[in-house]
């Protein structure tokens, strides 16, 4: 991936943007998150994975009404979710977006069958060379797009009473495209109207992160309303520490058994800067990837947490990252700087 701005120059740019922001929270819907089964107080979230896919058709053609072998899907995913729940997990944020597999009716069956609180999303996925961005979005304004997402928040998704708990967006590699920036502006407008947090697939792309932070500043929205998704891919941890120190949420969402030590080392960098309160952990797993076998999402409770506890982290540290941080990151409220 080529970048036109060096990472050495990117860090002061991020610092300049972020230090200009001072967060002001509005009381709108404060203390609440929308789950598949309705609004709940954030205190009920408990141990939470903030970036998983319970099913997806990612890789297939875009589809506004995705089809699955529902019997096969449910017979595979529900037992696995029961296993996840037995490991102490109470809540999962499902990041499968519209046009590549979101089906809130199936998510409700999963939630009702397992007791896991599932949170779905609104928004469009702008990565994968914009493959899953609907054609009309290229012609529409940011305001017109935001109205669709705000309507899902106010009225429900796909004719149901299910409302989104966050906005899912994504940037391609390299310099941000016009459609990616427009979708992000639509996301900001949605946040200002609804208080939903913006979870944005950004990865190891400092240019995209900087552009997003510039736009947040232009609209007087705090970085605390923004999650840097797939941040574990970022090579320069100083960029993440800089973003976190000014309020942004850092999603380390590629955990697996084979990278436990890498995760411990990275988390320890945040601890050394008193920034454990800005980390989110997950796996980016998938319960039914294009109808295939499960891409598992159990490494955090089975491998990472035990290793953390034998490497100097405390139960309080683990609770901060897996319980308290998701509540604070996704509690519905507008977060502005004026």
Label the predicted regions:
Residues 4-7, 17, 23, 30-37, ...:
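Mid-to-C-terminal alpha-helical segments outside catalytic/metal-binding sites
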Residues 109-112, 117-119, 123-193, 249, ...:
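Active-site gating/metal-coordination segments in enzymes
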Residues 51, 92, 191, 250, ...:
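Divalent metal-coordination and catalytic microenvironments
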Residues 53-55, 97-98, 123-127, 172, ...:
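Active-site beta-loop-alpha junctions enriched in small/polar residues
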Residues 46-50, 55, 60-117, 143-162:
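Alpha-helical scaffold segments that flank or form the walls of functional sites
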Residues 58-62, 104, 130-132, 208-214, ...:
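Histidine/acidic-residue-rich catalytic or RNA/ligand-binding cores of hydrolases
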